[in-house]
């Protein structure tokens, strides 16, 4: 940035922090398509914004208002109560089924790897294993 431009701007806006905020807002406005009031001369948007402030081709009050408007937060509006009532009505569909009902399922309906039903509490059959359990215990040094 040209030092002369910044020094000229400090005369117009004595607070350097406010100057930076106003120049940044004007640079954003330029990037958004706002028309330029000075020639670009192959300068970037922040430099053009500072030149506009130094030449007083933009009003400082307009920049302040634009800056304030850009930083204000609009509170979110609450959802209408009708939607809440519908959501609460939908909670009934998620209710837990009765203990004796058919919907709950049973542990005896679970299938093992071969697709056979596993009885609840039944011991697994290890006779089909290739390595005896005693050999596995020796390997792990248990």
Swiss-Prot record:
**What species is given as this protein's source?**
Rhodospirillum centenum (strain ATCC 51521 / SW)
Tell me its EC number(s), please: 2.7.7.6
Annotated GO biological processes are: DNA-templated transcription
What gene does the UniProt entry assign to this protein? rpoZ
The subunit field of the Swiss-Prot or TrEMBL record says: The RNAP catalytic core consists of 2 alpha, 1 beta, 1 beta' and 1 omega subunit. When a sigma factor is associated with the core the holoenzyme is formed, which can initiate transcription.
Any idea what this protein is called?
Answer: DNA-directed RNA polymerase subunit omega
Q: Name one GO molecular function term.
A: DNA binding
- Compositionally biased intervals (Acidic residues): 100-116
Signal peptide location: none
Matching SMART domains: RNA_pol_Rpb6 (SM01409)
Pfam families membership: RNA_pol_Rpb6
Tell me if S-adenosyl-L-methionine is a UniProt keyword of this record: no
Question: Is-annotated flag, keyword Aminoacyl-tRNA synthetase?
Answer: no
Q: In which family does this protein belong, per the annotation?
A: Belongs to the RNA polymerase subunit omega family.
Segments carrying the region annotation (Disordered) are 93-142
Keywords of this protein's UniProt record, alphabetized? DNA-directed RNA polymerase, Nucleotidyltransferase, Transcription, Transferase
Q: Look up the record and report any one GO term of the cellular component aspect.
A: DNA-directed RNA polymerase complex
**Catalytic activity of the protein:** RNA(n) + a ribonucleoside 5'-triphosphate = RNA(n+1) + diphosphate
**Function according to Swiss-Prot or TrEMBL:** Promotes RNA polymerase assembly. Latches the N- and C-terminal regions of the beta' subunit thereby facilitating its interaction with the beta and alpha subunits.
């Amino acid at each position: 940035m040209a030092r002369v431009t910044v020094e000229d701007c400090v005369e117009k806006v004595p607070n350097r922090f406010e100057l930076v905020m106003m120049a940044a807002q004007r640079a954003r406005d330029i990037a958004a398509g706002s028309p330029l009031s000075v020639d670009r001369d192959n300068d970037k948007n922040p430099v053009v914004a500072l030149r506009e402030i130094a030449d007083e081709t933009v009003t400082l009050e307009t920049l302040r208002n634009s800056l304030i408007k850009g930083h204000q937060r609009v509170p979110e509006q609450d959802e209408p109560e009708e939607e809440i009532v519908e959501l609460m009505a939908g909670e009934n569909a998620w209710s837990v089924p009765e203990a004796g009902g058919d919907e709950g399922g049973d542990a005896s309906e679970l299938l093992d790897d071969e697709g056979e039903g596993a009885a609840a509490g039944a011991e697994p059959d290890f006779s089909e294993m290739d390595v005896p359990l005693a050999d596995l215990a020796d390997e792990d040094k248990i």
